[in-house]
Amino acid sequence: MKVWFPAALLAAIMAALPPPLAAQWPLHPQAGVPKGADGKPNLNAPFPRTADGHPDLSGVWDIISARNLEPNGPPPGRPPLVRGGDILGAFKDGLPIQPWAAKLRENRTNSQGLFDPDGNCMPQGPVEYHIDPQPFKIVQTPRQILYISESNYGLRTFYMDGRRLPEMGSVPPYWHGYSVGRWDGDTLVVESNNFHGVDPDNVDAKDLPDIFRSAGWLDHKGAPYTEELKLAERFRRPNFGTLEIEVTVDDAKAYTKPFTFRIIRRIVADGSEMVEYICHENQNFLKLTAPRR
């Protein structure tokens, strides 16, 4: 049974754990890891390439403390860096958020993550996986790239076979959206739409099923997105040990204009793998809530 914690507390606990405790699995020597003179992984070495010449993004990518990264702000012309599970904190002037969405985010934050999808065995939002304290794994092939999160074993598929992104509403909405990818030089560009988001017309309904209260979480603070969300992600591997993800959120129902931010992850180079993660649904203890005094 999965014990529920407020999302912020869970993120702090996971971030504080050393890798062997946060994701423990039998170690197996990892091939292709460049080593320095001291025999340790050289994370600043050049990134590997696949047989077709593209950057190889494969591997397990873990959270990295962004506290000391870019203390003076992002480089000129670059989007802000998200630190932790709160996207709002990356923007000095706040998010360009619609009034109803700001109210919903506040309610979700004040509930201390009661309806956070991860705490309710529901799929997280696609951006939540990027900022989650648990690792994710990328499996890269020429025709598909699989993005697998350790959290609830969330799976996203990036189709690389040249297909076009379907029209909005032409396919059923998906928790992880429908994603197609292409290479722009050494950058993987992924575009996604047809998400299962929150319905702004029903956010105040008292009898709304919990499954819908857990829909459309952009981050751990509950910044919402609707089924109008169009997501653009740019994955770049500047060196062996670093994965930089640039995300643009375009959702006119929830935000007054598109906005862009970055996340940085670090390769797991010690042979660790993701652990099996099973979350049991219909957890009765989630119903044992009472007003906080």
Regions found by a protein language model. Give the residues of each.
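PEST-like low-complexity, intrinsically disordered acidic/proline/serine-rich tracts
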Residues: V3-P6, L17-R293
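Classic N-terminal secretory signal peptides
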Residues: L10-A12, A16
